Amino acid sequence: MAFTVKDILSIQVAPALGCTEPAAVALCAAAAASLLPEKASIEALEVRVDPNIFKNGLAVLIPGTEGLSGLDMAAALGAIGGNPAKSLEVLGEVNPEHVKQAQALIKDGKIRLNLLADHKGLFIKVIVNAGENMAEAVVESMHDNITRMALDGVPVEKSSLIAPKESSKNARAAELESWLKGLGLKHLMDLLDDLDDEDLAFLEEGLDANMKLADYGLKHGPGLGVGKTLDRLMRQRLIARDMILDARILASAAADARMAGVNLPAMSSAGSGNHGLTAILPIKAVHKYLESDHESMLRAIGLSHIVTAFVKAFTGRLSAVCGCSVAAGAGATAGVTYLMGGNANHIADAIKNLMEDLAGIICDGAKSGCAFKLSTAAGTAVQAALFALQGVKVMETDGIIGASLEKTTQNLGALSTEGMIETDRTILKIMLEKQFSPD
């Protein structure tokens, strides 16, 4: 089965409010709670998650909560005030009263979080008990993919929240990833020829959303304030302004805002809001230094999303490797190289340069420190493109770099899915020890 660029954007790119993992848990809880009688009083709520959902949802702040975090809070908010029809923007209507009620549930010990330590792949199950009723929902494979809902043990057969099995987003995403793995870079680039006005408008929407996050981060300096600090250092003339620095500033400022729980949506890429920031914002930063037109920038962003999806097909949706660095970073450097007039060879060289530079960066969960990693990924994406256009490219004799971009990406996928299994377990072990240590 072949896919179009419109299919890729539809499956891989979507708005998300707050970090994607807590949003997915909130969505699952909201879907389950929607089956209960109106105004039912929640007596118990159980959340079961795979290790990577647990890792990425442990420390990141939740929008609309004035600095609260945790998957238990996300689930409670989703069940109390979430709107499952809004998918990953499920918490967009949460208010202070909902937060107060969620805190009470947690304080009273009514929320239980269980880690499914041996589960492979993205998985969330929420069970809500209220009076004589028990409702449940399951999200799996993709953050917004609700595969099951049931009330009192009876599966819900018809719901607008559950896609028909024959056309489920999960199945389409799996087919897309399998299809992408068989493509070369030239084919990926050819997909851009099919971008229409509707697609360009959607790409513009994503750019606008992510720029709002960057602008907020620059103005207010939430979280660690990495973007605002870089901007201040530049204004103090302690570091020099160039396109690399501007890319770092935009990406990190947006990450500062998003990881601090600012109530603004991000346009995600490959299921991750931070991937979306990395895939889009460096291209915007570079554009103002060039004479290229606005549509060319949007097409470069389109290529970035395509390449990000291509790399993620090999590395997996969640792993011990920082996808913002190697997947969205690859997308960004492809887009930047394209915008600068590079050909397929230049783009392949740029991506290989970036992978050689960033392949070792681990994912130790979503949190404020991700702003540093997005800063690094964005700056390296621009630098890798500039190097490639100057004829600098990593040789195939070096480490995991292969003779082609496709082989290099396969090698990176093997590193991510096979080589980093124990790394992921160790990261999670350290995080769990911190979370439950009496110190």
From Swiss-Prot:
Superkingdom of the source species: Bacteria
GO molecular function, one term: L-cysteine desulfhydrase activity
Family label: Belongs to the UPF0597 family.
Organism lineage string: Bacteria, Pseudomonadati, Thermodesulfobacteriota, Desulfobacteria, Desulfobacterales
Protein name, entry field: UPF0597 protein Dalk_4447
One of the GO biological process terms: L-cysteine catabolic process to pyruvate
Family matches, as InterPro entries: Ser_deHydtase-like_asu, UPF0597
